[in-house]
């Protein structure tokens, strides 16, 4: 393709699209730029594989540190395992892109987005989402697009499109909305307890901007002389489907109407029907068209049976307004919770149950040094003081699988629950702990990420974290058949799997803190989104009320096994003194006291130990080392060593001075040992600090009141 460049004036900024310049062998490629941010996005299609029953789409987003003018750390000096942010951005691109491919498409598709230059004024993620749509169109892949995404921020009372990092940090909203010509297709947001009306207005505001980007893509396709590919779906043999419908429809409908069945019981009953069909087909002659259709591939029978089950479940919801467990459309499953379910060695724990979904969250309080360093990110010098990790073991759905490292799904769910809690965490100045919550999904039947939000709240309150408000969450679903739309509250697994939407909303009684909407259809109107958001509020508040019956306030004390933190400020110029050459001094204090010391560049020193007395001892040493001395100050100290001309006294932790023999008494002293011995407590006064920083002490001219005060202060410091 010949080189082509198009500039779009968008919200006061230019977005530049360069086609045909880079990656000429990719199916489609575009370099999308705004400011000094540049993202190369490619889309490539390969022939499909036989026997698969899903779209093999892979989306990868990567960042190169050269984009920010940096060289990677480590021995290899090369980018290694992708940081969490790039995994989340890969998901951000995938989620609005995937629903727009035809359901019948089985070709291997790969979209790769590579940030090649980074401008701190222009985040690259939403550019990558829009670029993925453009690359797909250029690659002539069947696609129900175009699709585009923008970020919406809220600074003061004003919504802004594609805010800078600084504006995101200062604002109360960070919302990404993606859409197609058919409506909104994906929303993801973190918010500072914003009311529902503000979120709905922000989505509407963002979608208007998305429409402008969609129009620009259509113009680009026309200018390139391309057409949006709409391949006809392959013909589907209805033989097997008709056979199963004739023999199993009544039984499937009967099972779906048995509302008292649990998920395992319902699955087992449906499996019996499916197995009976399989047995009947196996008894047919080998040349029978039905048997041939069922054995065309190993998944033909199972997938056809699933599609028929899906049809009847959806019709039951649309026609009867009742769900497979008998609930009304807006009804939440039974909720229960507990705190303190694990021994006190665990700093805080919460168990949350909603229907057959069960999540156990455990909270650990750490020191500032436990914060997660994000230096592998293009945004440098960042760290996280709150971490949430989500685990989804196979036994949670009754399966046996190898245990592996967290995948994209686990990382995404963990990040969403983390985002939901961030706005209610106490300020660092009030609660300097680093906080980690791990949510273990012990049983899954839908909405485990929102179960993790609820479990996290319970665990934090049990750990004594003074959160501003408790947070709860609920997942909403959707069934859309033609013009008939049904919004479902608190979806369970089968409704998520067979439905058209998964809309997770978390927040407090004051407003929304996080939401994430994913679609399986090509777009949704704002009216339906608004209905889902308002319906989610009722569910959230119902769940929150149940949680508050378990624990209504954070505990007033942390676990006895949590570290005790003491924070002091020192002159930043004294940091080197405390650390010492090669860290010798600070290591010595740690070894002597058993406390851990963290020092920040501004002179904030955090000292931690499970035993508070150890922390106090380390604090006193640091304070003594960094305390400004004045001539005439009086201290109680101990003699540490003796030399012929005087005695050395440690009068503050880590700080020594010398008493010359002439200053030991108001009479002539023949030998130092005649007056003091090593280990003796003595009252001394700072006589002089010479130009080399040496401290000269005296025992002369000390008033009895000064001596008494010094002894009292020394007792406290010990």
Swiss-Prot record:
<dbReference type="GO" id="GO:0004654">
    <property type="term" value="F:polyribonucleotide nucleotidyltransferase activity"/>
</dbReference>
<dbReference type="InterPro" id="IPR036456">
    <property type="entry name" value="PNPase_PH_RNA-bd_sf"/>
</dbReference>
<dbReference type="InterPro" id="IPR027408">
    <property type="entry name" value="PNPase/RNase_PH_dom_sf"/>
</dbReference>
<feature type="domain" description="KH">
    <location>
        <begin position="563"/>
        <end position="622"/>
    </location>
</feature>
<dbReference type="InterPro" id="IPR012340">
    <property type="entry name" value="NA-bd_OB-fold"/>
</dbReference>
<dbReference type="Pfam" id="PF03726">
    <property type="entry name" value="PNPase"/>
</dbReference>
<keyword id="KW-0963">Cytoplasm</keyword>
<dbReference type="Pfam" id="PF00013">
    <property type="entry name" value="KH_1"/>
</dbReference>
<keyword id="KW-0460">Magnesium</keyword>
<protein>
    <recommendedName>
        <fullName>Polyribonucleotide nucleotidyltransferase</fullName>
        <ecNumber>2.7.7.8</ecNumber>
    </recommendedName>
</protein>
<dbReference type="Pfam" id="PF03725">
    <property type="entry name" value="RNase_PH_C"/>
</dbReference>
<dbReference type="GO" id="GO:0000287">
    <property type="term" value="F:magnesium ion binding"/>
</dbReference>
<keyword id="KW-0694">RNA-binding</keyword>
<dbReference type="GO" id="GO:0005829">
    <property type="term" value="C:cytosol"/>
</dbReference>
<dbReference type="GO" id="GO:0006402">
    <property type="term" value="P:mRNA catabolic process"/>
</dbReference>
<comment type="similarity">
    <text>Belongs to the polyribonucleotide nucleotidyltransferase family.</text>
</comment>
<feature type="binding site">
    <location>
        <position position="502"/>
    </location>
    <ligand>
        <name>Mg(2+)</name>
    </ligand>
</feature>
<comment type="subunit">
    <text>May form homodimers or higher order multimers. Interacts with RNase E (rne).</text>
</comment>
<dbReference type="InterPro" id="IPR003029">
    <property type="entry name" value="S1_domain"/>
</dbReference>
<comment type="function">
    <text>Involved in mRNA degradation. Catalyzes the phosphorolysis of single-stranded polyribonucleotides processively in the 3'- to 5'-direction.</text>
</comment>
<dbReference type="InterPro" id="IPR036612">
    <property type="entry name" value="KH_dom_type_1_sf"/>
</dbReference>
<dbReference type="InterPro" id="IPR012162">
    <property type="entry name" value="PNPase"/>
</dbReference>
<keyword id="KW-0808">Transferase</keyword>
<dbReference type="GO" id="GO:0006396">
    <property type="term" value="P:RNA processing"/>
</dbReference>
<dbReference type="Pfam" id="PF01138">
    <property type="entry name" value="RNase_PH"/>
</dbReference>
<dbReference type="GO" id="GO:0003723">
    <property type="term" value="F:RNA binding"/>
</dbReference>
<dbReference type="InterPro" id="IPR020568">
    <property type="entry name" value="Ribosomal_Su5_D2-typ_SF"/>
</dbReference>
<dbReference type="InterPro" id="IPR001247">
    <property type="entry name" value="ExoRNase_PH_dom1"/>
</dbReference>
<dbReference type="InterPro" id="IPR015847">
    <property type="entry name" value="ExoRNase_PH_dom2"/>
</dbReference>
<dbReference type="InterPro" id="IPR036345">
    <property type="entry name" value="ExoRNase_PH_dom2_sf"/>
</dbReference>
<dbReference type="InterPro" id="IPR004088">
    <property type="entry name" value="KH_dom_type_1"/>
</dbReference>
<keyword id="KW-0479">Metal-binding</keyword>
<dbReference type="Pfam" id="PF00575">
    <property type="entry name" value="S1"/>
</dbReference>
<dbReference type="GO" id="GO:0000175">
    <property type="term" value="F:3'-5'-RNA exonuclease activity"/>
</dbReference>
<feature type="domain" description="S1 motif">
    <location>
        <begin position="632"/>
        <end position="700"/>
    </location>
</feature>
<dbReference type="InterPro" id="IPR015848">
    <property type="entry name" value="PNPase_PH_RNA-bd_bac/org-type"/>
</dbReference>
<feature type="binding site">
    <location>
        <position position="496"/>
    </location>
    <ligand>
        <name>Mg(2+)</name>
    </ligand>
</feature>
<keyword id="KW-0548">Nucleotidyltransferase</keyword>
<dbReference type="InterPro" id="IPR004087">
    <property type="entry name" value="KH_dom"/>
</dbReference>
């Amino acid at each position: 393709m010949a080189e082509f460049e198009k500039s779009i004036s968008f919200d006061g900024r230019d977005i530049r699209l360069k086609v045909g310049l880079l990656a000429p062998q990719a199916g489609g490629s575009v370099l999308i730029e705004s400011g000094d941010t540049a993202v190369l996005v490619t889309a490539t299609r390969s022939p499909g594989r036989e026997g698969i029953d899903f779209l093999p789409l892979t989306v990868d987003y990567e960042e190169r540190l050269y984009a920010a003018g940096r060289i990677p750390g480590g021995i290899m000096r090369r980018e290694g395992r992708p940081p969490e942010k790039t995994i989340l951005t890969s998901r951000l691109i995938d989620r609005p892109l995937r629903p727009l491919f035809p359901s019948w498409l089985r070709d291997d598709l790969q979209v790769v987005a590579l940030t090649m230059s980074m401008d701190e004024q222009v985040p690259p993620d939403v550019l990558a989402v829009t670029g993925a749509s453009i690359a797909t169109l250029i690659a002539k892949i069947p696609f129900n697009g175009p699709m585009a995404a923008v970020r919406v921020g809220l600074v003061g009372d004003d919504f802004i499109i594609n805010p800078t990092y600084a504006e995101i940090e200062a604002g109360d909203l960070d919302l990404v909305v993606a859409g197609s010509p058919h409506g909104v297709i994906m929303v993801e947001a973190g918010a500072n307890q914003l009311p529902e009306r503000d979120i709905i207005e922000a989505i509407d505001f963002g979608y208007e901007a998305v429409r402008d980007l969609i129009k620009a893509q259509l113009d680009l396709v026309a200018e390139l002389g391309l057409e949006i590919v709409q391949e006809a779906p392959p013909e589907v043999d209805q033989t097997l489907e008709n056979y199963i419908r004739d023999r199993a429809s009544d039984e499937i409908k009967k099972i779906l109407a048995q509302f008292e069945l649990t998920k395992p019981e319902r699955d087992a009953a449906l499996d019996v029907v499916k197995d009976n069909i399989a047995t009947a087909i196996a008894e047919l002659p080998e040349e029978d068209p039905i048997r041939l259709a069922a054995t065309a591939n190993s998944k033909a029978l199972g997938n056809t049976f699933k599609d028929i089950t899906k049809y009847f479940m959806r019709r039951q919801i649309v026609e009867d307004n009742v769900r497979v467990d008998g609930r009304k459309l807006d009804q939440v499953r039974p909720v229960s919770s507990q705190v303190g379910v694990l021994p006190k060695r665990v700093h805080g724990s919460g168990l949350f149950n909603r229907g057959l979904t069960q999540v156990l969250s455990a909270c650990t309080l750490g020191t500032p040094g436990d914060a997660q360093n994000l230096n592998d990110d293009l945004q440098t010098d960042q760290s996280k003081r709150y971490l949430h990790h989500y685990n989804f073991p196979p036994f949670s759905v009754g399966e046996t699988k190898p245990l592996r490292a967290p995948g994209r799904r686990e990382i995404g769910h963990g990040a969403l629950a983390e985002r939901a809690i961030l706005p209610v965490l106490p300020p660092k100045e009030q609660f300097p702990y680093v906080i980690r919550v791990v949510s273990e999904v012990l049983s899954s039947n839908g909405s485990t990420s929102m179960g993790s939000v609820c479990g996290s709240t319970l665990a934090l309150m049990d750990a004594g974290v003074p959160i501003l408000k408790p947070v709860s969450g609920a997942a909403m679903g959707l069934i859309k058949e033609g013009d008939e739309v049904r919004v479902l509250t608190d979806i369970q697994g089968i409704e998520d799997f067979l439905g058209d939407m998964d809309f997770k909303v978390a927040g407090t009684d004051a407003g929304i803190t996080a939401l994430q909407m994913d679609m399986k259809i090509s777009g949704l109107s704002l009216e339906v989104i608004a209905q889902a958001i308002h319906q989610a509020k009722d569910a959230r508040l119902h769940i929150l009320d149940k949680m508050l019956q378990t624990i209504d306030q954070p505990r007033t004390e942390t676990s006895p096994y949590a570290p005790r933190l003491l924070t002091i400020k020192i002159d930043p110029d004294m940091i080197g003194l405390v650390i010492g050459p090669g860290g010798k001094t600070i290591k010595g204090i740690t070894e002597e006291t058993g406390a851990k010391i963290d020092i920040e560049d501004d002179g904030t020193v955090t000292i931690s130990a499970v035993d508070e007395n150890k922390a106090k001892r380390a604090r006193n040493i640091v304070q003594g080392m960094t305390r400004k001395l004045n001539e005439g100050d009086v201290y109680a100290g101990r003699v540490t060593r003796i030399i012929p001309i005087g005695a050395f006294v440690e009068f503050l932790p880590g700080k020594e001075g010398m008493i010359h023999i002439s200053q030991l008494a108001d009479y002539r002293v023949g030998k130092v040992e005649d007056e003091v011995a090593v280990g003796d407590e003595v009252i001394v006064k700072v006589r002089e600090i010479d130009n080399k920083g040496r401290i000269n002490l005296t025992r002369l001219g000390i008033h009895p009141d000064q001596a008494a005060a010094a002894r009292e202060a020394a007792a406290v410091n010990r």
